[in-house]
Amino acid sequence: MSTESTEERILAALEEDAQASYAAIAERADVSKPTVRKYIDQLESDGVIVGYSADVDPKKLSGQSIAMVGIDVASEQYVEATRTLQELDSVQALYSSSGDHMLMAEVRAADGDALGDVISDEVLAIDGVTAAHPSFLQERLK
């Protein structure tokens, strides 16, 4: 048996395959199905598991461009700007960051031109947003 805790083994199985059945997770984590169910229910209730998602290869999506956008925000307008960014349909994910930018956003649009329009017309139009630095995703490597 692994030195990882039961919770860590269950979470690792879910991170590898969010669609895995309780039976598959139980086998991988070396616990019973009821134990898996109990842990998952508790982790969801505690807000540790906040959702399940699919990993998407952007190159296989026809007619869609994806960029990770570093966003700089005036400190005094951070909360409101963040709320507004969260409401944009084209922003698929938004993260606070300790790197070069205060926020990192995954932005999707029909193509590169549309993505540029979203950044200039929507993201940069938000009060408090001082700069946006897009990096267009080319190929998923892992």
Swiss-Prot record:
Pfam families linked to this entry: AsnC_trans_reg, HTH_24
Domain HTH asnC-type: 1-72
A Gene Ontology biological process term: response to amino acid
CDD domains: HTH_ARSR
UniProt cross-references to SMART domains, sorted A to Z: HTH_ASNC
Xref: NCBIfam families: TranRegLrpA1_Halo
Record flagged with keyword DNA-binding: yes
UniProt organism field: Halobacterium salinarum (strain ATCC 29341 / DSM 671 / R1)
PROSITE patterns: HTH_ASNC_2
Keyword terms, alphabetized: DNA-binding, Repressor, Transcription, Transcription regulation
Keyword rRNA-binding listed: no
Domain of life: Archaea
One CC-aspect GO term: cytosol
DNA-binding region: 22-41
Induction text: Transcripts accumulate during exponential growth. Is also subject to negative autoregulation.
Name of this chain's protein: HTH-type transcriptional regulator LrpA1
Listed GO MF terms: sequence-specific DNA binding
Organism taxonomic ancestry: Archaea, Methanobacteriati, Methanobacteriota, Stenosarchaea group, Halobacteria
Name of the gene: lrpA1
Function: Transcription factor that regulates genes involved in amino acid metabolism. Represses the aspB3 gene, coding for an aspartate transaminase, in the presence of L-aspartate. Another target gene is the basal transcriptional regulator tfbB. Also binds its own promoter.
Changes seen on gene knockout: Leads to strong induction of aspB3 and OE_6130F.
